[in-house]
Amino acid sequence: MSDTGSTATKAKTAAIVSGYFSPLHVGHLDMIEGAAELADEVFVIVNNNAQQEIKKGKVIIDEADRLRVVLSLQAVDHAIVAIDEDRTVSASLAQLAETFTDYSLIFANGGDRIPDFVPEAATCEEHGIELVFGVGGNEKADSSSRINVELGLEDAQSAPPSATT
């Protein structure tokens, strides 16, 4: 049985954000700063190299470098590289919930995520993690894929349609 807890019974609240951060851009900063407004602390899951290969076809910026950049941000209290082997961060969310049992956790999603399809929803429900949407704004401020396509680091065919417009 999982401990779903409530904000009233936990000592602290942490908002969890996830992303590739390859490269980090203003939309990521908006999301992280928005998460900081929701909770006492901000935890970041940096998608791993295998996930980057699944999404983009190659590693553009190594996971250790992306983690280091994220950890340097003033608003970030804790960051990990994802342990997942697919494009979700379900296993990483479960790991954080099992590690930080004294926290009420929020999975903060940016403007490009919608409640209708969140692959991590079942994990959040199982571990009592609240889902929040529109963190940092309801519109996507920028796209790592757009930046990478313009720099010639990512093929336009592999990028999501919104990244090339």
Give short role names for the model-derived ranges.
Residues 1-165:
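Nucleotidyltransferase catalytic core that binds NTPs
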